[in-house]
């Protein structure tokens, strides 16, 4: 059910991506399922790059560098592969937007939220957690909110700001 809900939402990711690109932004889209990521990349009209778990280190480094240099304005990431140790914040003056499919893992979500929002970024970032209301994702969003609030409480309230 989760995979189907995420796959059904791919056209929304595409529409938001195209709108963001038309407004002069770069986009990072985070997915939980490879099928959704591939469908997204097949539907978007702009060139894109990807960060996935089974890619070679050289490919990953090149894809990150191309996105950071704004050679490519769209980066599609598997949320588990695009979390730790990845900086995709604005270094060139092109604002970043992240579109995030919800996951049960608060840690993965927190990591995804940190990819484009960094000290030293040249422009503000915007981040959207997109879930399909009335589906299993509503439950996921509620569970995620509880987990993120627990993390927030443990860290003295300084990590998540207005998303809660």
Identify the residue ranges that each predicted region occupies:
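Conserved helicase/translocase motor-coupling segment
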Residues: 1-46
């Amino acid at each position: 059910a989760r995979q189907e809900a995420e796959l059904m939402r791919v056209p929304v990711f595409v529409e938001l991506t195209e709108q963001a690109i038309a407004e002069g932004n770069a986009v990072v889209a985070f997915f939980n399922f490879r099928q959704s990521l591939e469908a997204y990349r097949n539907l978007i009209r702009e060139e894109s790059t990807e960060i996935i778990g089974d890619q070679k280190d050289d490919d990953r480094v090149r894809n990150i560098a191309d996105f950071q240099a704004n050679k490519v304005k769209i980066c599609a990431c598997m949320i588990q592969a695009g979390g730790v140790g990845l900086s995709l914040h604005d270094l060139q003056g092109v604002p970043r937007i992240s579109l995030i499919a919800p996951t049960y893992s608060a840690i993965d979500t927190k990591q995804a939220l940190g990819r484009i929002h960094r000290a030293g970024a040249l422009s503000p970032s915007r981040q959207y957690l997109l879930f399909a209301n009335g589906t299993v994702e509503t439950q996921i969003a509620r569970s995620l909110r509880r987990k993120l609030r627990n993390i927030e409480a443990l860290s003295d309230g300084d990590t998540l700001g207005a998303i809660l």
